[in-house]
């Protein structure tokens, strides 16, 4: 095996390595590592957060960036935000729909 898995927690790293040992690819390992990291250290990432990835597909000339950050809720439109010069961090309008799961799906596809 000529792969490497690195994460902030040994259990997350072990999960990624195990995926590679079972025949998964780097994307599979990255997703598994990220999911486990969200369980063992939820303050660092997880299902309720966003996902950003820099991915290089074998044979491509350059990597691409996946931005799976959250988006506004379905009832939010520009007119509902126009009265704010700044939105307080503890205001409901400052919360986005988490993008991590959508990012895992996009990476897998």
Feature annotation, model-predicted:
Residues 1-22, 26-109:
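Noncatalytic scaffold domains of N-terminal-nucleophile
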């Amino acid at each position: 095996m000529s792969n490497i898995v690195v994460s902030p927690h040994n259990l997350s790293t072990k999960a990624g390595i195990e995926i590679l040992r079972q025949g998964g690819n780097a994307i599979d390992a990255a997703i598994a590592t990220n999911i486990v990291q969200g369980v063992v250290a939820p303050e660092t990432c997880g299902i309720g957060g966003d996902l950003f990835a820099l991915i290089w597909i074998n044979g491509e000339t350059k990597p691409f960036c996946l931005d799976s950050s959250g988006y506004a809720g379905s009832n939010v439109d520009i007119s509902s935000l126009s009265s704010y010069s700044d939105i307080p961090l503890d205001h409901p309008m400052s919360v986005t729909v988490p993008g991590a799961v959508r990012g895992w799906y996009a990476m897998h596809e």
